[in-house]
Amino acid sequence: MDPKGWRVELNDGHFIHALGFGTYAPNEVPKSKAVEATKSAIDAGFRHIDCAHLYDNEKEVGLAIRSKIQDGTVKREDIFCTSKLWATSLRLQLVRPALEKSLKNLQLDYVDLYIIHFPVAVKPGEEHLPQDEQGRMIFDTVDLCATWEAMEKCKDAGLTKSIGVSNFNRRQLEMILNKPGLKHKPVCNQVECHPYLNQSKLLDFCKSKDIVLVAYSALGSQREHWIDQSSPVLLEDPVLCAMAKKYKRTPALIALRYQLQRGVVVLAKSYNEKRIKENVQAFGFQLTSEDMKVLDGLNRNLRYVTLEMFAGHPEYPFSDDY
């Protein structure tokens, strides 16, 4: 089945494509690469493009989308584009200007989904990760329920079709869901999710509240300087590799297919054209229920993206069980 057709309904009536293209790349990757990679992704069949202000490449991704609309490959309504509100803009008066800046960079009139990237607020300003002289994060104190009300206003104004969150734990989701006067529920919670961190408790909770779980770092995580270098490489896992041989697929495809069959929307991040084309093949086969159980058994609650620089803040999400 092709990736354009497989969509999941959100609790506000809109639909999200089950497989998305992740646009994040480490700083050392030239920004121009985002243009080519996004074009390749759209050519390969990706229609769900996951962006963020934090990635500093929304202009480039926007150029790619614009060029694929201009050359007739897609129409705007074929594309599901996500952007994210960064931690420097969680004060309610900063939410709409942040979204408007992303729209300007993306050259779009609206995004399909706008999400709160991280529940910890840091000092507003141009610097993504403001630090004091000791190298500690400069936090801000923000009422996330007020931030959410500003997100709701963005949806009502037509700047985004849907609104959601990312990196929220159960307690933080409940805080939004139980907010007096809640107008729009979050449609999704985008979190790190892969066979080593399968998020089964959070997934069950989200399903019970009609919130879609979206998986980032679904293939483990690239060897970045801020990732613990001693952590095991997911795609080299012997069980995953044996299963890949059995299905005549790559370990990456097994990891992506695993999420699709659990009802998780999954992001595949690659700037390599061959792998981009390969990742859309996640729709071309099915894992047996026995093999799904085997993959469930790989869980070891291993989080690659700990974002420990935020750990001193009361809203740091990863201290709770889930």
From Swiss-Prot:
GO terms for biological process: steroid metabolic process. Keywords: Cytoplasm, Lipid metabolism, NADP, Oxidoreductase, Steroid metabolism. The record marks 84 as: Lowers pKa of active site Tyr. InterPro entries: AKR, AKR1C, Aldo/ket_reductase_CS, NADP_OxRdtase_dom, NADP_OxRdtase_dom_sf. One of its GO terms (cellular component) is cytoplasm. The active site is at residue 55. Substrate binds at residues 31, 117. It is an enzyme of class 1 (oxidoreductase). Pfam families: Aldo_ket_red (PF00248). Detected in follicle granulosa cells (at protein level). Detected in heart, lung, liver, kidney, stomach, uterus, testis, skeletal muscle and granulosa cells of the follicle wall. It is found in: Cytoplasm. PROSITE patterns: ALDOKETO_REDUCTASE_1, ALDOKETO_REDUCTASE_2, ALDOKETO_REDUCTASE_3. NADP(+) binds at residues 20-24, 50, 166-167, 190, 216-221, 269-279. It comes from the Eukaryota. Its EC number is 1.1.1.-. One of its GO terms (molecular function) is oxidoreductase activity. Induction: Detected at low levels in preovulatory follicles. Up-regulated in preovulatory follicles during luteinization 12 to 36 hours after stimulation with human chorionic gonadotropin. Up-regulated in granulosa cells 12 to 39 hours after stimulation with human chorionic gonadotropin. Detected at low levels in corpora lutea. Detected at constant low levels in theca interna. NADP-dependent oxidoreductase that has 20-alpha-hydroxysteroid dehydrogenase activity. Belongs to the aldo/keto reductase family. Monomer. This is Aldo-keto reductase family 1 member C23. It comes from Equus caballus. The gene is AKR1C23.
